[in-house]
Each structure stands twice: as structure tokens, then as C-alpha cells.
Amino acid sequence: MTNITFHGGVNDIGGNKFLVESKDTKVFMDFGMSFSQEGQFFSQFLGARTSNSLNDMFELGILPKIKGLYRRDYARHMDFDGNEDTEIDAVLLTHAHVDHCAYLPYLREDIPIYCSEESKLILQNFDETSSSQYLTAKQRFQIYENKKGTMSKATGDKVAIPRRVEIFESGKEFSIDSIGVVPLPVDHSIPGVHAFILHTADGSIGNTADLRFHGRRKDDTEKFVERCAESDLDLLLCEGTRVDAVPSLTEYDVESKVVDIVNNTKGLAICGYPVRDLDRLLSFYIAAKNSNRDLVIDMKQAYLLKLFHASDALRGKY
């Protein structure tokens, strides 16, 4: 029998953590942060205690209390076993927005994360421009005797363990033990978003991820809808944050309005948008070109573009 357990993402914005169990296969779809829970207990400069983070997150109901799921250095230090084998076969990541990926650093490094090339590079950008640990797990509680004969805490690359990241190919089915997975691109405000169709022993499950119909890749979303209709789904997990919202401006409308505003502005024009929204970056880039201006971006976004350019699969896409 196939079961789905929702450990977040229901009646909430974000926090998606869907556990699919079929036969002996267990797969999480996303492992993200709930904005409402984080806002209730934490703030920008106040988070879970490093020395007791798992227990804090369990006590507050933010993370599911599942043995074998979390990184062993945390689990052992916080008396949550840490020596058992994991029963989780993989995490399927729809995309690299924090409400879908923020808690990946808590997971065991030997649980494979399946994602798109774009999502992997965005996670790499997080790691290399902040203290995040999406692609590596830096062991926190290792003590050693230093040259002076006193005890020191091991830090840096010498305690970094690479996570197992598997890049899937859009539209190409692959298997995680008994579950077949078809990743299909959809349009959203960050590159590399993929919906999933899972084929289990008991039927097919669709997960829309976050999707929209008004961006530069709306055709991808429409093709996914068609694929769902063809797949005879038994269950559809659908993102519904703005399901009843009135139609909004398209990205091309935004581009046109920005051109008009910038052309009617003297002197410096300053804009704000999410660093990883490269479609919005393109809108402002086109507006800058059409108004004979130079577009200046921040270093994190510049580095993300560099990572994309270094990828054979993504070079020239942005």
C-alpha cells in the first residue's frame, strides 16, 4: 500500500515535507521551511540553538521526529541516537526556494538529493556566499588534541562531508527503488523548478511544485498540465497559495512597464527583486538596454550567473 504523510505544507505557505512510502521505498518530496512557524518562534537574529537545534525543532513541532533522517553529528550530540541506518531512500527537490529546501542541511549527508542542475547551482550559490550547508555537511562537534596539547574544535573543510546530489534530466523518467519518477519543468520565479509524477505499485501521484502561468516559461506549465491529463493520476498534490487570485501581470507586462518607468526617470534608477529570480533580472536587463542604461547587479547574483555560465547544460540560458 502507498502512503503519503504530510509533515508540513498543508494549510500553510511553505514548509513542504511530503513523505511517500510505497512497498519498502520511502521518499521525501521537498524539506522546506514554514514561514508561519519560523515567524512564530524565530527572528532574523534568533534561531534554534546550535548545540541543541534538533531538540528545539522537535519541541516546537517544526521538524518531524524521525530516527535515521537527520545528520549523525547532530543526532549523537543531542541524544537522538545517530547510529542507526536510515530508512529514507531519497529527497526529491522541486526547487531551491527556502520554503521547499531550507531544512535540507539537517538531513543525513548520505541520503541522496535529486534535483535539477539549476537547483544544484543555486544551492551551491547559497553555500559559497553564506554559512549554509546544502551541498556539504560540516561536522560540528568534533574535538581533537592540537599541537599545544590542548583540545580544539575541528572546523572548516577538514570536517566537511559532501552530500550525495543526483541531477535528473527534464522529462526523463528514473527510478528510486520501487518508485518511478518523471520530473517535468514548470514556470516559477526561480530557475529549474520541476513538478513530479510518481508511479508507485498502487497508482500515480502528481506534485505540481510551485507553478504559474504568467512567466516566461508558461508553456512548460501548460505542458505539465497536459501530461497530468494523459497520466491518469490517482492523486494530485497542488500548490494553492494563490489558487483563487485574479490574473496578474505577465513577466512581459512587467518588462514593458519597467521600460516606460525607466525611460521617464532622470538620473539613477534603483530596483529591487529577489536575487535568484533570473527572469526578473532579464526584464530589468532588457529595460536597461532599451533605455541606454547600464544594469548593475549585486555580487551574489553575479556569482550565480557565473555558475550558470560554467555549466555546459545552462551556458547562454541567462
State where each predicted segment sits.
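His/Asp/Glu-rich metal-coordinating catalytic cores
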Residues: 2-12, 16-90, 105-279, 283
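Short, surface-exposed beta-edge/turn micro-motifs
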Residues: 15-17, 294, 312
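Metallo-beta-lactamase
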Residues: 88-99
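A generic "binding-loop/recognition-motif" signal
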Residues: 97, 119, 301
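Loop-centered beta-sheet repeat module
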Residues: 267, 277-295, 300-303
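A contiguous, basic/glycine-rich beta-loop/short-helix subdomain that forms a polymer-engagement track
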Residues: 299-318
